[in-house]
Amino acid sequence: TRGRIKNIVAPGDFLPAKPGSGDDAPGLACVNAIYFKSDWASAFTEGETRSHAFHTGPDAAGHAMLMHQRSMLKYAKDEHFQFLEIPYLGEDYCLQALLPVEVLPIQELLSQATPDALSNLSRQAVRQEVDVLLPTFELRTRVGLKGLLGRLGAESVFDSRRAELGRMIHARPDAERVYMGSMWQDAWIRLDEKGTEAAAATTSISFPLGCSAESISMPVSFHADHPFLFFIVHRPSQSLLFAGWITDPEQGAGPGTPSP
């Protein structure tokens, strides 16, 4: 991660959860990392970054530094959202942003922004001239994944009686059973006029058990001056590398979740 994420595993991670309880101590840490850095295909002009009002909620507002550019970009809109795609240099990667038409509380935004909504707008997007205001931001998050994976049906890897991880570590037939005790994801993302730099690492602590269309000439506005979602995507494979949300650029953002 080029030093952006440090101390993802600490000595204390290999101590029993309750010292003196007789519980097993972790015996293995699995680390998965991803790093991304790229300039914009069409850079924002630093001299045009200005302080603007940023509506953090329906009845709340602060200020944020918003970058500006006017470029030919893929854009779409429906009754609920605006969609914008900004390519990085080389155009294999892009930033996608989903901006609600109205200022919404973050939980309502997350409930409305379904995968189908994003997919439909992405397919409908056409290249046209877009006037863009986008905040600069930097975020650093740490998210526990045990509960999330459990809700996705992966409970067994955290169960000392059901986990079957021996083949992954070439365990001996007589070795103690290995299971996941916890899983954490650390992410760091910075977005500015030049481009985006992002890094993430996922750690699991294991325990031994005793196409574009014709462009449209009329410019449209995509002014991200209220909470929105963002995604860093590998375009050829449509793989999602990072995802998160911005509620207050001055205070950071929601989890930047990698999908390496």
Regions found by a protein language model. Give the residues of each.
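Non-catalytic, conformational "gating/processing" segments within enzyme and secreted inhibitor domains
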Residues: T1-V103, R123-S215
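Soluble, non-membrane globular domain cores that form compact, hydrophobic packing
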Residues: P11, P105, L109, A117-L121, ...
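Extended hydrophobic
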Residues: C30, Q82-L98, A213-S259
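Catalytic and substrate-binding regions of extracellular carbohydrate-active enzymes
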Residues: T114
